[in-house]
């Protein structure tokens, strides 16, 4: 999937933990805090999932037949069918995680918290501007970097009332997602489309594939047509009037079981 110069990758990882509750100085707290552990990890992984085979190679295909030689003989033409990218390299994700796990009140209550930062570099995407020579075929490219960071919390309680056992558990997670770099040759990349109209975009400073479009302002009482904000006061709706309409990626999620 990659050219020979970038075919191999090295993706290290390391993790460690410290069970503080097993230390001698912690003994006075064990009646309340049954177990307390700190965790930390860092690692990288590589991905080529977005690439098909030989994406770095320009493919040739048989074209039309043309009368280019004497004697009414025809010659078959050959032309590029796809444009390869010989600078492709691994998409790399690097994640740091810091966490704490605790059991309290003889194990009846459990609590955990994690803080994570995940940075994806050299994100592999397609949909870049096609070559005019070979028509609408696009080339994959290591187009940008993405940052994800947030917190994860979980709190639970379990106990018995006579022969009846019960447990309650809740969780909360936050996430900030942002494109932190985009190849200078690109302004934004199109994502999902509907009836050939782009709905989502990949753009620096915004969440991954955020919704970009016109701001609805109401209904024209005379015609019944929808109206939209003319943000640049040009008198017409243009691409410059489109704005950030939000993201499909939630800022936080939660659950109770």
Predicted regions mapped to residue ranges:
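Extracellular/periplasmic, surface-exposed regions of secreted and cell-surface proteins
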Residues: 1-203
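Flexible glycine-rich, low-complexity coil/linker segments exposed to the extracellular/periplasmic environment
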Residues: 63-83, 195-247
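Short, hydrophobic/aromatic alpha-helical segments in well-folded domains
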Residues: 84, 99, 240-241, 253-257
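Conserved C-terminal beta-signal and adjacent last beta-strands/turns
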Residues: 167, 247-257
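Intrinsically disordered low-complexity regions specifically enriched for long asparagine
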Residues: 173, 229, 252-256
């Amino acid at each position: 999937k990659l050219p020979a110069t970038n075919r191999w990758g090295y993706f290290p990882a390391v993790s460690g933990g410290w069970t503080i509750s097993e230390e001698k100085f912690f003994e006075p707290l064990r009646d309340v805090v049954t177990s307390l552990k700190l965790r930390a990890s860092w690692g990288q992984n590589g991905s080529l999932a977005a690439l098909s085979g030989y994406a770095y190679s320009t493919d040739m295909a048989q074209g039309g037949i043309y009368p280019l030689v004497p004697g009414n003989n025809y010659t078959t033409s050959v032309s590029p069918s796809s444009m390869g990218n010989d600078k492709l390299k691994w998409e790399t994700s690097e994640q740091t995680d810091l966490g704490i796990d605790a059991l309290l009140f003889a194990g009846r209550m459990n609590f955990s918290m994690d803080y994570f930062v995940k940075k994806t570099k050299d994100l592999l995407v397609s949909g870049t501007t096609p070559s005019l020579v070979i028509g609408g075929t696009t080339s994959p490219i290591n187009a940008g970097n993405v940052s994800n960071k947030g917190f994860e919390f979980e709190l639970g309680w379990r106990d018995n009332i006579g022969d009846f056992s019960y447990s309650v558990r809740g969780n909360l997670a936050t996430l900030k997602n942002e494109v932190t770099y985009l190849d200078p040759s690109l302004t934004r990349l199109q994502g999902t489309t509907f009836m050939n109209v782009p709905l989502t975009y990949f753009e620096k400073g915004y969440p991954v594939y955020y919704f970009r479009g016109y701001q609805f302002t109401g209904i024209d009482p005379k015609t019944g047509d929808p109206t939209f904000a003319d943000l640049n006061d040009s008198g017409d709706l243009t691409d410059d009037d489109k704005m950030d309409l939000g993201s499909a990626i939630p800022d936080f999620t939660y659950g109770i079981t």
